[in-house]
Amino acid sequence: MPYEWENPQLVSEGTEKSHASFIPYLDPFSGEWEYPEEFISLNGNWRFLFAKNPFEVPEDFFSEKFDDSNWDEIEVPSNWEMKGYGKPIYTNVVYPFEPNPPFVPKDDNPTGVYRRWIEIPEDWFKKEIFLHFEGVRSFFYLWVNGKKIGFSKDSCTPAEFRLTDVLRPGKNLITVEVLKWSDGSYLEDQDMWWFAGIYRDVYLYALPKFHIRDVFVRTDLDENYRNGKIFLDVEMRNLGEEEEKDLEVTLITPDGDEKTLVKETVKPEDRVLSFAFDVKDPKKWSAETPHLYVLKLKLGEDEKKVNFGFRKIEIKDGTLLFNGKPLYIKGVNRHEFDPDRGHAVTVERMIQDIKLMKQHNINTVRTSHYPNQTKWYDLCDYFGLYVIDEANIESHGIDWDPEVTLANRWEWEKAHFDRIKRMVERDKNHPSIIFWSLGNEAGDGVNFEKAALWIKKRDNTRLIHYEGTTRRGESYYVDVFSLMYPKMDILLEYASKKREKPFIMCEYAHAMGNSVGNLKDYWDVIEKYPYLHGGCIWDWVDQGIRKKDENGREFWAYGGDFGDTPNDGNFCINGVVLPDRTPEPELYEVKKVYQNVKIRQVSKDTYEVENRYLFTNLEMFDGAWKIRKDGEVIEEKTFKIFAEPGEKRLLKIPLPEMDDSEYFLEISFSLSEDTPWAEKGHVVAWEQFLLKAPAFEKKSISDGVSLREDGKHLTVEAKDTVYVFSKLTGLLEQILHRRKKILKSPVVPNFWRVPTDNDIGNRMPQRLAIWKRASKERKLFKMHWKKEENRVSVHSVFQLPGNSWVYTTYTVFGNGDVLVDLSLIPAEDVPEIPRIGFQFTVPEEFGTVEWYGRGPHETYWDRKESGLFARYRKAVGEMMHRYVRPQETGNRSDVRWFALSDGETKLFVSGMPQIDFSVWPFSMEDLERVQHISELPERDFVTVNVDFRQMGLGGDDSWGAMPHLEYRLLPKPYRFSFRMRISEEIPSWRVLAAIPETLHVEMSSEDVIREGDTLRVKFSLLNDTPLSKEKQVVLFVDGNEYSVRRVVIPPFKKEELVFKVEGLKKGEHLIHTNLNTRKTIYVR
């Protein structure tokens, strides 16, 4: 006979039928939890014995006579790995043991035995007594007073036992034996830590002999979504009562008004009573307006309360509707996880999660990949979040082939059905739940089909979701079309045809490490085309465990950090918040893209405000506008705007007189009063518009500049600043300002970035390795300099591996300014470029940075919608985000200028017109070498990156997808320039030293050719200035555009272009360009 923990047809023994959750009850008026009078919490310390397997526990451990005085104590709820027993194991797909379903390891099956003596009051024995386990992983036996009661498997739904006949007044012994591995483990392969133990609440409660066993509340709305209907099923159970009892049902409105709906006398028997009630114009429940009604049910002494809401979920013409309005799923996936408690998540942590989600415009959470604690759903009802409730089924490590998958094996049918049914029965009254999800990545087959058909009969008020069906095409038994990580062309293809089902991305925007690029691009498509209804980002929280290294430094641990094998490393670090719920930069982008107010510029002073909320008028928010001049607020005003959901209103802004500065208009909406999830003033939506681009002033510099040279160095002195260049390397080696050394290392061209997790997934370190070499192995090909009256230009030419070329020019002016110019001419056969810029280090004393550009958090080419143009100031140590696995971090995009300061001296850098930059208190090599944030050393320097740009982050997935094409630095010529100055004050960023702008262009070709010959038109472009020139040369033949070529001409260099013109007919032809060159040729 197989063991009970290795038989999927045995799902439980001795347990009660599933029912709706009633304990504790969340009072929607006070926000407090209520417990019944006859209630004993068994949370707290239990005696605990840990064994290698179930065969190594003492034979009579459940006996009342057994002496457990030398056992340890353990907290319940908890995961025993988090208390030092066994090791945490993280895998994504593979099982931690050799899969052979339904069998699990015999010798290595960690087992925990829990014992606790409890006192039962004597008056309880007039009633029925139940023991409730909300969650035990993965299999457990129960003994009471030495008698075996039963067992249960599903780790994420309750197991409840009737104990009336085995308990006695006074002292009683509860014994629980928990096995880490069971056949149930094959259905719990859910990309998370493999923990074990009694990790959710445990309690005893008593009910009258004749009591309400279950309640099912359903609501509907009429065709106008105005009036409502309540459908109520009350299941009563009699275990020995002989007298009739009064059943009373009372409706309590969100305003606290009470109305009796039912009052009748019922016989003491097992039965279900069904009722229907009409409610005129009830307040509707939604994530925006979570109006909760209460049904108070009394049967004699038994009283139960159920929160519910009036709402309707449906599909019409392929569109997902909620209370008649098209619903966008602006969601995240969430694992139940705490860095200190594992899966034993506290209510405080749940509330923290929900408030953060609401504050960042998230409206949906998918309980990936199992039913959560019951309190989570109460809180989602109360605060307002849509929930995709997912059954505790994932068999990812088993082949999904129809002949192999557990979803098609008859012996696994009961296990699938039991888990899905237990979820539905427990959670069926929560208005926040809009979809039942059958599971995740568990193949497709008849076991899911049967469960889905049962749901449709049991609950017709919600939709059924299961992504696994789409792997074999659409399935009739699910209501929505769901995919994971689809590329945008798949969305566009789906939207191009008439569809019956809405498209939901149950997982998208894989947020591993520094990620979630191009989120706005996805939502531009979603909001433009039909049938597309959003999705849930993977995922909410980095599953990193708080740990200390050998030096006592804290870090977030991931797979492999506990000696666990097999493991999947940091693939559990996919969140938009850190393990302690510190927001990651991605979360700010999510908030911006998910916002429900759209603002568009209609004319210079008129703006269209569109209300994209479904049930909220914009009058609920305070509007405000600000005008920023060069990043500083110069005018601001508040306003109110009345706009019903879906309406648009025009907003007129009185604009000031504007000089040559840069001006931005910022329009925002914030909460006008406190809510349960955020305080008054919390910004829910904003947009920023460029009112006027800056005008740069070109100023002649009259101050002189000196030049000295020796065998190794070239020294340029201007005002109080000295620039030292190496003749051996061609680099700017040192800057001295009033004899203070500014540089700790030379200014070097840099084409590499520390790989992100997405980069590693698409093999960027291997594919683009030549650019890492280019940053280190450049060879100085040529160096020359030129002194003029008010400036010195130092020009270096470098050859890079792969035969690419870099040209750098430093032009030092008499006022101390230096213009830095870089041209990159990649070879034809090199791959795309990770980054284009310069890198250098300065002393650690330069520990404060100010900038004008996007902020305050980090932004990147494809993740910068949330970056607000303004002036900012931070400590260098605050400029990076501490990703769990160190990687590229801290970039600021579209920066006009930045300045590093040591309190006296400022290193000022301004773009021409803009740059990206980042600063780190360590080196790039440090960042790339270490695997945990605690390993980053303390350095006596600050690394400074001044960049044209780096490629986007991507995020479609983290196992192969590259940044979208429009966010990649393809191998073609690039140029960029910036200005640098060392001074005591921040200079004007819009005043530049005047330099020649001349570009000499010559065009030549044959004067006469024969018909059929090719005409070769040659252009020579001489750049005799210290700045690179980028030109687009357009060739016209007889007034018609013939060809376009782009060229970058480095400083002091001549470039040649040759156009070939074919097919000229006999006669005279005019050849000219957009560069004011022309020539007439003749064809014979």
Curated annotation (Swiss-Prot):
GO biological process: lactose catabolic process
Assigned EC number: 3.2.1.23
EC supergroup of this enzyme: hydrolase
Gene3D superfamilies registered for this protein in UniProt: 2.70.98.10, Galactose-binding domain-like (2.60.120.260), Glycosidases (3.20.20.80), Immunoglobulins (2.60.40.10)
Superkingdom of the source species: Bacteria
Keywords per UniProt: Glycosidase, Hydrolase
Catalytic activity: Hydrolysis of terminal non-reducing beta-D-galactose residues in beta-D-galactosides
Keyword Phosphoprotein assigned: no
PROSITE patterns, per database record: GLYCOSYL_HYDROL_F2_1, GLYCOSYL_HYDROL_F2_2
GO molecular function, one term: beta-galactosidase activity
InterPro entries the record matches: B-gal_small/dom_5, Bact_Beta-galactosidase, Beta-gal/glucu_dom_sf, Gal_mutarotase_sf_dom, Galactose-bd-like_sf, GH-type_carb-bd, GH2, Glyco_hydro_2
Active site residues according to the UniProt entry: 441, 507
GO annotation, cellular component aspect: beta-galactosidase complex
Family: Belongs to the glycosyl hydrolase 2 family.
Matches recorded under NCBIfam families: betagal_LacZ_Ttogales
Protein's name in the database: Beta-galactosidase
Organism per entry: Thermotoga maritima (strain ATCC 43589 / DSM 3109 / JCM 10099 / NBRC 100826 / MSB8)
